[in-house]
Amino acid sequence: MIQLQKPKLILENGLRTDGRKLDELRPIKIELGVLKNADGSAIFEMGNTKVIAAVYGPKEMHPRHLALPDKASLRVRYHMTPFSTDERKNPAPSRREIELSKVIREALESTILLNLFPRTVIDIFMEVLQADAGTRLVALMAASMALADAGIPMRDLIAGVAVGKADGSLVLDLNEQEDMWGEADMPIAVLPSLGQVVLLQLNGFMTPDEFRRAFELAQKGISSIYALQKEALKNKYLEYKEE
């Protein structure tokens, strides 16, 4: 059996393998209203990770007996396209995709005002077009932006980032190498204006002090992401006004 040797993640000049500083985000691009047949849609890119999200609804639930009397039902599908990774994947939903659909749905339920739309359903589809670490968070943010594009009332947008440990150092917004070879990976998503955490997972090990510093580092990154999200919505609104 071939033993793969762990690559050096932090170079001698103190930078990461992709040239970023330890506390630097990957380039972010957000595009709204990309699908004409959806009620709301968005493409969210973080580095080489790219996700498209589409929202349909609120609409009447079929069959009707499944409708909830006091709020809307939320159906969420997270899916990685067969061409999203180096190795072609089976198009059938994997256990990981089913689990992440559930995790993302629970995070979205904390912000959507579902009680305003009883007996209806909102469908959210997320397709990972390119995967290079952080797909669950990018998918969650793409869904949040698509919901805003659809005009569905929310308590706040969701912004998130992963903080990890690579070669003993805390790093913001992991790339694929750091995700694969790092000692820890902690994705965090929040409702920034409310300071409410809606997703927090830790894979690997951090000391209590590292956890505290990682959380502070994540908050710094989330603040920058939230500003870009609001800017994208503002630009979309200005486009509508000009039309």
UniProtKB/Swiss-Prot annotation:
Q: What is its main location?
A: cytoplasm
Cystine crosslinks: none
Q: Name one GO molecular function term.
A: 3'-5'-RNA exonuclease activity
Q: Which InterPro entries match?
A: ExoRNase_PH_dom1, ExoRNase_PH_dom2, ExoRNase_PH_dom2_sf, PNPase/RNase_PH_dom_sf, Ribosomal_Su5_D2-typ_SF, RNase_PH, Rrp41
Q: What is its EC number?
A: 3.1.13.-
Q: Which UniProt keywords apply?
A: Cytoplasm, Exonuclease, Exosome, Hydrolase, Nuclease
Signal sequence residues: none
- GO CC field: cytoplasmic exosome (RNase complex)
Can you say where in the cell this protein is located? Cytoplasm
Ranges in coiled-coil conformation: none
One of the GO biological process terms = gene expression
One Pfam family hit:
RNase_PH_C
Q: Which NCBIfam families match?
A: ECX1 (TIGR02065)
Chain's role = Catalytic component of the exosome, which is a complex involved in RNA degradation. Has 3'->5' exoribonuclease activity. Can also synthesize heteromeric RNA-tails.
Entries under PANTHER family matching the protein: EXOSOME COMPLEX COMPONENT, EXOSOME COMPLEX COMPONENT RRP41
User: What assembly does the database describe for this protein?
Assistant: Component of the archaeal exosome complex. Forms a hexameric ring-like arrangement composed of 3 Rrp41-Rrp42 heterodimers. The hexameric ring associates with a trimer of Rrp4 and/or Csl4 subunits.
The UniProt similarity line reads:
Belongs to the RNase PH family. Rrp41 subfamily.
Q: What is this protein called?
A: Exosome complex component Rrp41
Q: Which organism is it from?
A: Sulfolobus acidocaldarius (strain ATCC 33909 / DSM 639 / JCM 8929 / NBRC 15157 / NCIMB 11770)
Gene this chain is encoded by: rrp41
